[in-house]
């Protein structure tokens, strides 16, 4: 398990992370969600032991990560802009990574290099951003670390390659109980691979939980009434969002759906329809409730 306790990080006078607390269970795929500039990349670097927190700590299996070579051998971070030597080829980087990760599997490397159609003898500096991303994904899959951290994992991948990568990750989690943490601005990409998530906003984790459980606890409901309704009529509900237009009401509500429906039925609606929500909507509604200006109507 990865545990984060009271973590704070500043750059000069700017606070990037403040009192972050989080538990990530082994064998899970955790989606780190947040707006641009929220500190996701910094948090991943601290998780990987590349950067030291000013306060607090990160522990993996009850051992501190920073300045701990034993723990770091089990961690691989693929950043949004991965490091490579100026004239290095993919083959060169494979051998470089093998020094730090001697269990790098050549069979897996060749399998995914062929799938991604990458020439291992060409210099990475001449690759497109997408091809560079694919190259380091191939290395990550070949290394199969116990803890894999991915910053903007799907950036530069076409839909087929994204699906291939997701399937490979899922297979490795089943076989090796690998723990994967993915940050992405594309929440729809995370929804079908992540089982847990955390929302990083205003320098800290505001909400965290299981994806399915959270989605099951948030409901989008459309109603129509004979008479006009006011916002006060729905104040007994745990509302994330509400739009009242005369006799038509759109709600986003947290809680047990049967209890919510029973309450709304006492208001004798002409029509009531419960709609599914996706992870992107969960993020938007939670952020709005926290007072973050996601969009204006």
Language-model-detected regions and their locations in the chain:
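Conserved structural motif at the start of ABC-family nucleotide-binding domains
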Residues: 2, 17-19, 72
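The feature captures the beta-strand-to-loop junction immediately N-terminal to the Walker
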Residues: 30-35
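Conserved ABC transporter NBD signature motif
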Residues: 56-71
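ABC-family P-loop ATPase nucleotide-binding domains
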Residues: 79-135
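ABC transporter nucleotide-binding domain
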Residues: 166-255
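C-terminal coupling/interaction segments
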Residues: 252-297
């Amino acid at each position: 398990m990865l545990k984060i306790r009271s973590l704070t990080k500043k750059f000069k006078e700017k606070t990037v992370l403040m009192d972050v607390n989080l538990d990530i269970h082994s064998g899970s795929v955790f989606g780190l969600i947040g707006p641009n500039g929220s500190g996701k990349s910094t948090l991943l670097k601290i998780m990987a032991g590349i950067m030291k927190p000013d306060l607090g700590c990160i522990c993996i299996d009850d051992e501190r990560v920073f300045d701990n070579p034993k723990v770091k051998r089990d961690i691989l971070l693929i950043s949004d802009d991965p490091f490579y030597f100026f004239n290095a080829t993919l083959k060169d980087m494979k051998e470089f990574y093998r020094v730090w990760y001697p269990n790098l599997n050549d069979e897996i490397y060749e399998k995914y290099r062929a799938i991604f159609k990458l020439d291992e003898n060409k210099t990475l500096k001449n690759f497109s951003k997408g091809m560079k991303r694919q190259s380091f994904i191939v290395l990550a899959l070949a290394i199969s670390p116990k803890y894999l951290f991915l910053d903007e994992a799907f950036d530069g991948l076409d839909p087929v390659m994204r699906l291939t990568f997701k399937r490979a990750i899922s297979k490795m989690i089943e076989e090796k109980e690998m723990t994967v943490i993915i940050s992405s601005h594309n929440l729809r990409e995370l929804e079908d691979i992540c089982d847990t998530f955390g929302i990083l906003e205003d320098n800290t984790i505001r909400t965290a939980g299981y994806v399915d459980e959270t989605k099951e606890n948030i409901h989008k409901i459309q109603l129509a009434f004979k008479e006009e309704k006011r916002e006060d009529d729905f104040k007994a509900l745990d509302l994330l969002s509400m739009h009242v237009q005369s006799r038509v009401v759109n709600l986003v509500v947290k809680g047990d759906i049967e209890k919510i429906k029973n309450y709304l039925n006492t208001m004798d609606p002409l029509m009531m329809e419960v709609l599914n929500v996706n992870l992107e909507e969960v993020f938007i509604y939670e952020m709005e409730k926290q007072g973050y200006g996601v969009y204006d109507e």
